[in-house]
A protein has these predicted regions:
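Beta-propeller folds
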Residues: 1-484, 490-496, 500-501
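Serine-hydrolase catalytic core recognition
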Residues: 460, 474-563
């Protein structure tokens, strides 16, 4: 009986189950497989680049057609003038060590600036391309904290040297170089700006491994006297953790000067000038007011670039003062009274520039529950000789040494409801030339026509219209070394195409692009400027009526009103 039972069980195992449609059979008849001889899979040779976390960088000579390939590159920087290529190697093999290297593009010579550090960050070069600064650290990810150094190299030196770390004179006690900051050279190359920050601080309980999670403090304490409310503190916690404070390095003497700190967090650095001071702003005494007023006052200081000492210039300013190009004056728009003010930095004297003038320099159409901002300023003329201001329509010239303000556009804008704004054709220019005629954009507030006019910035006369059409004309760009310009023209029905002209006189205007052709197969629409009287006060208003291209005036259409 035992043998018969065993035979029946074997028969059941070998019997296949019926196949149900849509369901796979769970059991299949086993087939005896012949043993196969295993063949080893081919082993591909190891690519040495696989060891690197970097990528391949190709330096191509456009004149000769020659190229140089560099593998394992983590970061690179080609100088503005193209005379040096700086890059960071990640270790690929025994021949290529990790580090910062430089290639002289004129002769192809490569120089190793530094190697052996664990991490390099944020390479920055000067304008001439003969200097580089970067952050480096020997700390690994296993260390509790990373302490970075600032390293600097200039052409002619054998290697880069550490110019700032925790031990350098000028770095505050218990502070360190912050890799969260950016590195910037001044235009002259004589200064490097970067950031420092307090070293990480740990409470005793944080390092105590015997404490359970429930035994560790985890509370948020807030007081009504705190500068920011608790939700804002939480929102800014990450930024505050990574905050750094500006410091200046003199590349010739190696001297460090701390410019910013916890009491003066915001410093305005103009890398185009090597002045003996920088402008700093402090809003800490007024931050509690942000709970009910976003337009809070601010105190402004000048910080000596020799000593780091701060001198108060303006207390409780309701505006944002900015320095003139030569650094002689501070100008700002006071949002409380709507006037422009000027301070002589040397004497500290302040005067109202727009008091008694017949027009407003604050936004006349401002309609929100806040103080109106200004129409802005196009800037200064050479040597801080004149300061220019915008009103709603025209441009004004103000003499910082005294005298009456002059309406450069002679009131033409207000008389014709045309808003005019200065066009900076030389993108590298820092001041406004008062010689010859300047190009201004023009926009008719009522007809919506736009174009360009020219004006004498040193006098007072009606502008001369260059081009004015019932379409949007803008985006004026002038060639650097030729009297050629590009503009863009468009309407609701015509795409913003690019046009070229022989000069700012817009002669020989030629269409260069034809992107609008892609719209031809589609039913587009029309736009019509209409006028109506406001039933509330009788004022004449304007609106745009959009209709489909195949609009039938005999049909009724649904209408959406947006106001």
């Amino acid at each position: 009986p035992l043998k018969e039972t065993k035979k029946k069980e074997e028969a059941v195992e070998e019997k296949e189950e019926p196949v149900v449609e849509g369901r796979k059979s769970k059991r299949k008849k086993k087939k005896k497989e012949e043993p196969k001889e295993e063949t080893p899979e081919p082993v591909e040779p190891e690519d040495p680049r696989a060891k690197s976390k970097g990528t391949e960088l190709v330096l191509y000579n456009l004149k000769t057609g020659e190229s140089k390939s560099i593998t394992g590159v983590m970061e690179y920087s080609l100088t503005e003038k193209g005379n040096h290529l700086f890059f960071e190697y990640d270790k690929v093999d025994s021949l290529n060590e990790s580090g910062i290297h430089a290639i002289n593009t004129a002769n192809g010579e490569m120089t190793t600036l530094n190697e052996g550090m664990i991490e390099y960050k944020k390479m920055s070069t000067d304008e001439e391309g003969n200097q580089i600064a970067f952050f480096a650290t020997a700390n690994t990810k296993d260390d509790d904290h990373k302490y970075f150094s600032l390293m600097h190299w200039s052409a002619g030196k054998a290697s880069a040297t550490i110019v700032a770390d925790t031990t350098t004179a000028g770095v505050p006690e218990n502070w360190m170089v912050s890799d969260n900051s950016n590195i910037r050279f001044s235009e002259s190359g004589k200064r490097v700006y970067f950031g420092t920050a307090p070293r990480p601080f740990e409470y005793a309980y944080e390092a105590d491994t015997t404490l359970l999670k429930d035994d560790r403090p985890d509370v948020d304490v807030w007081s009504y006297n705190d500068p920011y409310i608790q939700p804002m503190q939480k929102l800014q916690a990450g930024r505050e953790k990574n905050r750094s404070f500006d410091v200046m390095l003199d590349t010739q003497t190696g001297k460090l000067v701390q410019l910013a700190g916890p009491d003066l967090e915001s410093v305005t650095i103009d890398t185009r000038n090597d002045r003996d001071f920088v402008l700093a702003m402090n809003d800490q005494p007024y931050r509690t007011q942000m709970t009910w007023d976003t337009q809070i006052p601010r105190d402004f200081y000048k910080i000596s670039t020799s000593t780091g000492d701060a001198e108060l210039l303006i207390k409780g300013a309701k505006g944002f003062p900015s320095l003139s190009p030569a650094g002689n004056y501070l100008t700002w728009h006071n949002i409380e009274d709507g006037h422009w003010y000027m301070m002589n930095v040397a004497s500290g004297n302040i005067k109202n520039l727009t008091e008694g003038m017949s027009v407003s320099f604050a936004n006349e159409l401002h309609d929100s529950p806040s103080l109106a901002g200004s129409y802005g300023t196009p800037g200064w003329s050479d040597d801080d000789a004149a300061f220019f201001l915008y009103d709603r329509y025209d441009i004004w010239r103000v003499d910082p040494k005294g005298g009456s303000a002059v309406n450069v556009t002679n009131g033409f804008g207000r008389q014709n409801k045309i808003t005019m704004r200065y066009q900076r054709l030389d993108r590298e220019a820092r001041t406004i030339s008062t010689e010859g005629r300047a190009t201004l954009s023009a926009f008719n507030e009522w007809t919506k026509a736009s174009g360009f006019v020219t004006a004498n910035m040193n006098g007072s006369s009606d502008p001369q219209i260059v081009v004015m059409e019932d379409m949007s004309i803008g985006g004026l760009i002038k060639a650097k070394n030729a009297d050629r310009v590009l503009v863009r023209k468009s309407t609701y029905q015509e795409y913003s195409e690019v046009y070229a002209a022989n000069s700012v006189s817009m002669t020989g205007l030629k269409k260069l692009s034809n992107v609008g052709a892609q719209e031809e197969p589609y039913n587009w629409g029309t736009a019509e400027l209409i006028e109506f009287d406001n039933t509330y006060d009788g004022e004449t208003m304007q609106a745009i009526l959009y209709k489909p291209e195949n609009f039938d005036p005999n049909k009724k259409y649904p209408m959406i009103a947006y106001f």
